[in-house]
Design a protein with these regions (language model features):
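Divalent metal-coordination and catalytic microenvironments
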Residues: 4, 26, 73, 133, ...
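Structural signature of hydrophobic alpha-helical transmembrane segments
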Residues: 1-3, 78-83, 137-144
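Transmembrane helix-loop-helix hairpins at membrane boundaries of multipass inner-membrane proteins
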Residues: 14-116
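A conserved hydrophobic secondary-structure block that centers on an alpha-helix together
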Residues: 88, 92-140, 145-163
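Hydrophobic alpha-helical segments of secondary membrane carriers
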Residues: 167-168
């Protein structure tokens, strides 16, 4: 689950030292590896017990003890396969698409930023579908909203992309109001 976050950090912060192409390939490879592992877990090739896996204690204050935990059940296994498999295909498609992208001037470094956003979106979606408590679900929900805004507005030089990103942000913000009632 934390693999795409690692890929996002590598693509976002290390592309200057390791190169843009290496960063994008690493981010893509991490998501593909996650998809392969999710298929093994889904098909019960790797034995994973149902329940919750506590990653770390998050908030401890008096009688309040909130843990960052990953829920493991049949639904989560299915959603891990869906999210990681689709994200792998999107990453692979983006590798080819970005190779011939004419929306930027030659020499501009932008591909690593896109893959950082895309990997962060994958991570936020994984947090959302595997959350064990409402606080963690909220962070996944908000992460998906932020990542959507960043991805939709990626071509920030185009006014249409900026308008679409703002519309998406407003729509997602409106739907956030309904989260506590569901």
């Amino acid at each position: 689950i934390f693999g795409p976050l690692l890929g996002s950090l590598i693509a976002g912060f290390m592309y200057r030292s390791i190169g843009e192409n290496v960063a994008t390939i690493l981010a893509t490879s991490i998501v593909i590896l996650g998809a392969i592992i999710s298929w093994f877990v889904f098909l019960d090739i790797v034995a994973v017990d149902s329940g919750s896996v506590v990653v770390f204690d998050w908030i401890i204050s008096g009688s309040l003890n909130s843990q960052w935990a990953v829920k493991v059940d049949s639904l989560v296994k299915v959603m891990l396969v869906v999210v990681l498999s689709v994200s792998s295909l999107v990453h692979l498609y983006s590798l080819g698409y970005m190779r011939h992208d004419h929306n930027w001037n030659s020499g501009e470094k932008y591909k690593a930023r896109f893959f950082s956003y895309l990997s962060f979106f994958t991570f936020a979606m994984l947090v959302l579908v595997s959350s064990d408590n409402l606080l963690q679900l909220f962070f996944g929900w908000e992460g998906v909203g932020v990542a959507s805004y960043l991805l939709i507005g990626f071509y920030f030089k185009k006014p249409t992309a900026n308008n679409a990103a703002m519309k998406a942000f407003i729509a997602v913000s409106y739907t956030h109001l309904t989260l506590p009632t569901t």
